[in-house]
Design a protein with these regions (language model features):
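Glycine-rich phosphate/pyrophosphate-binding loop at beta-loop-alpha junctions
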Residues: 1-66, 116, 121-159
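Active-site-adjacent helical/loop segments in soluble small-molecule enzymes
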Residues: 56-125
Length: 159
């Protein structure tokens, strides 16, 4: 985020941070609106194990709170949908084998574009059918059994 903000200081990209709902410390900090980070405690159970920290990195918090357009707290079905979409893409798109934490971006983009629940967010960040989106999947198939349950058995359905 810092890199792209410095690269395009007059017209930076729109940044969206996605977190597992069970461990949404950055989202909670942004929601509080006082500039202070938040720690989420308790049961951090989520399929997005790589995002289940519950405590923000203090050094990055300042950059995030100043340059991110939206923080989104995502339920597990968002990640599962992203895994399915990446793993079984539409004709012509490449297959991407992404784990739960890496696929949340794809699932969120789909939810933002396809559901009224995210209409306000879609408008706030200026996302439309002409937008160019760059996503990073930071995780491969780290749990083959869970991957199969999500893709083959429909675990965490969207409907």
């Amino acid at each position: 985020i810092g890199y792209f903000t410095n690269l395009f200081p007059n017209d930076p990209p729109t940044f969206v941070v996605m977190e597992a709902r069970a461990a949404d410390c950055l989202y909670q900090g942004a929601l509080a609106g006082d500039g202070q980070p938040r720690i989420v405690e308790g049961d951090l159970k989520t399929i997005m194990a790589g995002l289940a920290c519950g405590e923000p990195n203090i050094l990055s918090w300042d950059i995030l709170r100043n340059h991110v357009s939206a923080f989104v707290s995502c339920p597990d079905w968002v990640s599962a949908r992203g895994m399915r979409m990446l793993g079984v893409p539409v004709k012509g798109d490449p297959t991407v084998i992404s784990g739960e934490s890496g696929a949340v971006g794809m699932g969120l983009i789909a939810a933002i574009m396809e559901t009224d629940e995210y209409k306000e967010l879609r408008e706030a960040i200026g996302l439309d059918r002409f937008s160019q989106v760059l996503m990073f999947s930071t995780e491969g198939n780290t749990d083959p059994m869970k991957f199969r349950k999500v893709l083959w058995d429909g675990e965490y359905p969207t409907v």
